[in-house]
UniProtKB/Swiss-Prot annotation:
Changing E586Q: Moderate reduction of the sodium-dependent ion transport activity. This is Electrogenic sodium bicarbonate cotransporter 1. The modification Phosphoserine is found at residues 61, 65, 68, 223, 232-233, 245, 256-257, 262, 1026, 1029, 1034, 1044, 1069. Changing T529S: In PRTAO; decreased cotransporter activity; mediates electroneutral sodium/bicarbonate cotransport rather than electrogenic sodium/bicarbonate cotransport; no effect on cell membrane localization. It is linked to Proximal renal tubular acidosis-ocular anomaly syndrome: An extremely rare autosomal recessive syndrome characterized by short stature, profound proximal renal tubular acidosis, intellectual disability, bilateral glaucoma, cataracts and bandkeratopathy. Loss of interaction with and stimulation by CA4 is the cause of retinitis pigmentosa type 17 (RP17). Residues 1-466, 521, 572-585, 711-725, 808-819, 856-877, 919-960, 987-1079 are cytoplasmic. Keywords: Cell membrane, Disease variant, Glycoprotein, Ion transport, Membrane, Phosphoprotein, Retinitis pigmentosa, Sodium, Sodium transport, Symport, Transmembrane, Transmembrane helix, Transport. Homodimer. Interacts with CA2/carbonic anhydrase 2 and CA4/carbonic anhydrase 4 which may regulate transporter activity. Isoform 1 but not isoform 2 interacts with AHCYL1 (via PEST domain when phosphorylated); the interaction increases SLC4A4 isoform 1 activity. Interacts with AHCYL2. Residues 748-779 are annotated as: Interaction with CA4. The keyword Protein transport does not apply. The chain crosses the membrane at residues 467-491, 502-520, 522-542, 551-571, 586-609, 693-710, 726-745, 780-807, 820-836, 838-855, 878-894, 902-918.
């Protein structure tokens, strides 16, 4: 009773019989990318139905049949709308839901070989298509592969394939060590089951063991050499009148001797570069289809081997074969066989059917897999789409996880460590982060951080053994050196050289190297920040006005601040970071990015002021422009007589001789020498420096544009994949080198990078260590605790917000964070820097983001047409440590670094500022303000939040950002960290303006793609709940088979391809129709 289909009581009214033209029309219906359904159903255990219950059901069924046509129509229409699970889906649930400790099935490479005549003489198996994710065809010219494209299948071919699986031989988990043994096993099985006549065994075996010709990539010279051969072969094929006839084909199969079959891969297979697209554990699925003249009925076999075996030259690439599908049929249906081969090959590349093929126990499991595929396909009308058009692979593939989870029984399966969305009842944040859970014990968080990071300490060094790490080191090194020089110069101006460029280099090297070696998150880069610089300026002026020793006062502030930071570490105060939502993070990171962009242009404008452009210069009037050095009035000479002047092109003479010697020409002096020795510059062209500003802007914008272009070169169609990846990894270094060479070739005297050449304190009034007592009153040591509180807030906010941004879930970090451990080492380094009078260092947001971007990893083997998948970041300690060691050694590399133009480094600053804004939701929402509604992207928050509410949220964020910018630009910048803290309060106040539903989508740190995934899971659960309630109220118990639509091949074709006979009377009977249709 279980195998009987539910009767379709409307089948008796079926009077239309398909004619031949309608059957042919099925071939023009094409199937595109299938979209997974989102419903699933919980399995229910039902007790067996008793005799009385069966009678009751029969009575209900009879009453149902006696209803009026109107009632039947109403009920049928309502029942159609109910989401029902097909028997195929139910069977797949049990297949995929079984607990299996074995590893996931490997990636499959599927190859379609067709039996074709070669040079009009010999029949061979010729490769015509291949699949990993997408289909690649051998073009009609036969000399090249097509671009990867989405496989479009005729609906008819899928039904024919289903019939093949029903009628053919299914051989699962067989053992074979060679192709002849496997072929003999298949043929013997066909004879035993009565599907093949014994006298045809030799012919079938010979056909299946014919030579395989693969479409391998040839070199240009080889391709040119084969042109003549191809042309001559083609001419013989078209001039031979007997080519393709049955007699000729039979003679081809019997005239030549059987080729030697080798189990080892051939040289062409081993040299095939296509292996780079396959993972190491890949297996092969071979599809062989063809037409022969000695068969009256098709020869069909589907084989799955117990262990994958190398079958010689059967496959284009040297991978072991696990699956083999064979279809040999009578003459006249080559196109149908080809489409069936494409259908099974496409199914083998489908992730769900791929898993079913590995786990299937019998024929019915495989048929259920085909039915599930049919349940998910989308049919395109033939009049609205040309099947000859090749569909480009999408940039992002629909995940098959939903289809698999729907059947495997997993309801709360989380991918890539994702956490379920809170359902709109919270504002996001980091409450689910293990690193931020408060322990309630003394130093509990610090101890947990150490225990979490200790097992990865060794791997943090050998994980850096990759060429990508070298590019990251060079890129971040140049950024760090530039930053150290910039802040060192500003500190020198603010503190009267008590801290200068050399102190900045030394502090950066010491602090950064120690932090990267021992901190919890070594991907974070330490640097001086703007608020620290403002504090240093105010502290120096305060000390100067009150006659305090600046360095001693600063020492005690640093010690108090370090002590307060250690208290925060001991009390697990870093748990407060969980209140830093996307609103706070994006406001802070966007502000720092804008500062980098602003400073880059500010420095270029300042350079243009120093080297002005003479906009009134006229080429034809050169005589109007002059600049001459004239001697000063002798009465005003104040230079001592023993001063000697030595321009490089003049003999050495005393100043007295210079001023009184009438033959001395002052016009030979340079501008610098003229000003140095008291001369006067006269002329309207003295402040004009030709070409420097224009050349500097060329270098500046050129470096930025080149860096952006080369970074995106990975997705370019030019050059092989390895070369594109290498260029992308070294994009910044290549840009710097290119424009350094351009600057050297042009020869314009652009400003260059200046590095201290001597290792000594910038100011002669200080040493390398600061004594804690001596210059200031004793009470200053205690009073320093007050400004230290402000510094502590500054350090805590800068450090922890940057750490939160670095540890975002979209970076897919696997070794965990270490907020408490990071703050601990920042406190220790504050003590060291305070004792040595070095600048204080804290996490730098933009440089840290650039460091992460330079270490991002993607899949090494991507199927043709498939976009590389982001795997995570190369977490290690080597790149940061070497960056800071090189920074310390930069003093000894000054002769090399002096050739780098400063505009090139400013261009790198601009790139870092712009690149760190990529993927920030705040920037996406800013762009929405300029986009018409119809052109707006499909962001998840636009699905659920009204657009005016989105704009209001963006406006408030822009307002906060503007206030922070104004605050940063004034004297009140010292309270900048407090205002960052105020962003948390502003975000809390938004609870009164926005609903929790809106905030859950606008203010969340979960990446967009993950949020969409979670939304689809929520919809699936809702449908599941409604499905269960529908099933509880239905009359049909779940244990019985649910009706499904089946289109049998015998009804679709008057002459099925599997049999030359016409449908029997039984197949035309109403009973037969009832068994193959549904209500």
């Amino acid at each position: 009773m279980e195998d009987e289909a539910v009767l379709d009581r409307g089948a008796s009214f079926l009077k239309h019989v398909c004619d031949e033209e309608e059957v042919e029309g099925h071939h023009t219906i094409y199937i595109g990318v299938h979209v997974p359904k989102s419903y699933r159903r919980r399995r229910r255990h039902k007790r067996k139905t008793g005799h009385k219950e069966k009678k009751e059901k029969e009575r209900i069924s009879e009453n149902y049949s006696d209803k009026s046509d109107i009632e039947n129509a109403d009920e049928s229409s309502s029942s159609i709308l109910k989401p029902l699970i097909s028997p195929a889906a139910e069977r797949i649930r049990f297949i995929l839901g079984e607990e299996d400790d074995s590893p996931a099935p490997p990636q499959l490479f599927t190859e379609l070989d067709e039996l074709l005549a070669v040079d009009g003489q010999e029949m061979e198996w010729k490769e015509t298509a291949r699949w990993i994710k997408f289909e690649e065809k051998v073009e009609q010219g036969g000399e090249r592969w097509s671009k990867p494209h989405v496989a479009t299948l005729s609906l008819h071919s899928l039904f024919e394939l289903r019939t093949c699986m029903e009628k053919g031989s299914i051989m699962l988990d067989r053992e074979a060590s060679s192709l002849p043994q496997l072929v003999e096993m298949i043929v013997d099985h066909q004879i035993e089951t009565g599907l093949l006549k014994p006298e045809l065994k030799d012919k079938v075996t010979y056909t299946l063991l014919r030579k395989h010709r693969h479409q391998t990539k040839k070199s240009n010279l080889r391709s040119l050499a084969d042109i003549g051969k191809t042309v001559s072969s083609a001419s013989r094929m078209f001039t031979n009148p007997d080519n393709g006839s049955p007699a000729m084909t039979h003679r081809n199969l019997t005239s030549s001797s059987l080729n030697d079959i080798s189990d080892k891969p051939e040289k062409d297979q081993l040299k095939n570069k296509f292996m780079k697209k396959l993972p190491r554990d890949a297996e092969a699925s071979n599809v062989l289809v063809g037409e022969v003249d000695f068969l009256d009925t098709p020869f069909i076999a589907f084989v799955r081997l117990q262990q994958a075996v190398m079958l010689g030259a059967l496959t284009e690439v040297p991978v072991p074969t696990r699956f083999l599908f064979i279809l040999l049929g009578p003459k006249g249906k080559a196109k149908s066989y080809h489409e069936i081969g494409r259908a099974i090959a496409t199914l083998m590349s489908d992730e769900v059917f791929h898993d079913i093929a590995y786990k299937a126990k019998d024929r019915h499991d495989l048929i259920a897999g085909i039915d599930e595929f049919l349940d998910e396909v989308i049919v395109l009308p033939p009049g609205e789409w040309d099947p000859a058009i090749r569909i480009e692979p999408p940039k992002s593939l629909p995940s098959s996880d939903k289809r698999k989870n729907m059947y495997s029984g997993g309801e709360n399966v989380q991918m890539n460590g994702d956490t379920p969305h809170d359902g709109g009842h919270g504002g996001g944040g980091h409450g689910d982060c293990e690193e931020l859970q408060r322990t309630g014990r003394f130093c509990g968080g610090l101890i947990k951080d150490i225990k979490r990071k200790a097992p990865f300490f060794a791997s943090d060094f050998y994980d850096a053994l990759n060429i990508q790490a070298l590019s990251a080191i060079l890129f971040i090194y140049l950024a760090t050196v530039t930053n150290a020089i910039t802040f060192g110069g500003l500190l020198g101006d603010a503190t009267d050289n008590m801290q200068g460029v050399l102190e900045s280099f030394l502090g950066t090297a010491v602090s950064g190297a120690i932090f990267c070696l021992f901190a919890g998150q070594p991907l974070t880069i330490l640097s001086s920040t703007g608020p620290v610089l403002v504090f240093e300026r105010l502290l120096f002026n305060f000390s100067k006005d009150n006659n305090f020793d600046y360095l001693e006062f600063r020492l005690w502030i640093g010690l108090w601040s370090a002590f307060l930071c250690l208290i925060l570490v001991a009390t697990d105060a870093s748990f407060l970071v969980q209140y830093f939502t996307r609103f706070t993070e994006e406001g802070f990171s966007s502000l720092i990015s804008f500062i980098f962009i602003y400073d880059a242009f500010k420095k270029m404008i300042k350079l243009a002021d120093y080297y002005p452009i003479n906009s009134n210069f006229k080429v034809g009037y050169n005589t109007l422009f002059s600049c001459t050095c004239v001697p000063p009035d002798p009465a005003n000479i104040s230079i001592s007589n023993d001063t000697t002047l030595a321009p490089e092109y003049l003999p050495t003479m005393s100043s007295t001789d210079m001023y009184h010697n009438t033959t001395f020409d002052w016009a030979f002096l340079s501008k610098k020498e003229c000003s140095k020795y008291g001369g006067n510059l006269v002329g309207n062209n003295c402040n004009f420096v030709p070409d420097i500003t224009l050349m500097s802007f060329i270098l500046f914008l050129g470096t930025y544009t080149s860096s952006m272009a080369l970074k995106k070169f990975k997705t370019s169609p030019y050059f092989p994949t390895t070369a594109r990846k290498l260029i992308s990894d070294f994009a910044i270094i290549l840009s710097i080198l290119i424009f350094c060479v351009i600057d050297a070739l042009v020869g314009v005297d652009t400003p260059k990078l200046i590095v201290p050449s001597e290792f000594k304190p910038t100011s002669p009034n200080r040493g390398w260590f600061v004594p804690p007592f001596g210059e200031n009153p004793w009470w200053v040591c205690l009073a320093a605790a007050i400004p230290a509180l402000l510094v502590t807030i500054l350090i805590f906010m800068d450090q922890q917000i940057t750490a939160v941004i670095v540890n975002r879930k979209e970076h897919k970090l696997k070794k965990g964070a270490g907020y408490h451990l990071d703050l601990f080492w920042v406190a220790i380094l504050m003590v060291i820097c305070s004792l040595m009078a070095l600048p204080w260092y804290v996490a730098a947001t933009v440089i840290s983001i650039a460091h992460i971007d330079s270490l991002k990893m993607e899949t090494e083997t991507s199927a043709p047409g498939e976009q590389p998948k982001f795997l995570g970041v190369r977490e290690q300690r080597v790149t940061g440590t070497l960056v800071f060691i090189l920074t310390g050694l930069s003093v000894f590399m000054a002769p090399i670094l002096k050739f780098i133009p400063m505009p090139v480094l400013y261009g790198v600053f601009l790139y870092m500022g712009v690149a760190s804004l990529n993927g920030v939701q705040f920037m996406d929402r800013l762009k929405l303000l300029l986009m018409p509604l119809k052109h707006q992207p499909d962001f998840i928050y636009l699905r659920h939040v009204p657009l005016r509410r989105v704009h209001l949220f963006t406006f408030l964020q822009v307002l906060c950002l503007a206030l922070l910018w104004i605050l940063k630009s004034t004297v009140a910048a010292i309270i900048f960290p407090v205002m960052i803290l105020a962003l948390v309060a502003v975000r809390k106040g938004m609870d009164y303006l926005f609903s929790q539903h809106d905030l859950s989508f606008l203010d969340d740190v979960i990446p967009e793609k993950d949020k969409k995934k979670k939304e689809d899971e929520k919809k699936k659960k809702k449908k599941k709940g409604s499905l269960d309630s529908d099933n509880d109220d239905s009359d049909c118990p779940y244990s019985e088979k649910v009706p499904s639509i089946k289109i049998p091949m015998d009804i679709m074709e008057q002459q099925p391809f599997l049999s030359d006979s016409k449908p029997s009377d039984r197949e035309r009977s109403p009973t037969f129709l009832e068994r193959h249709t549904s209500c």
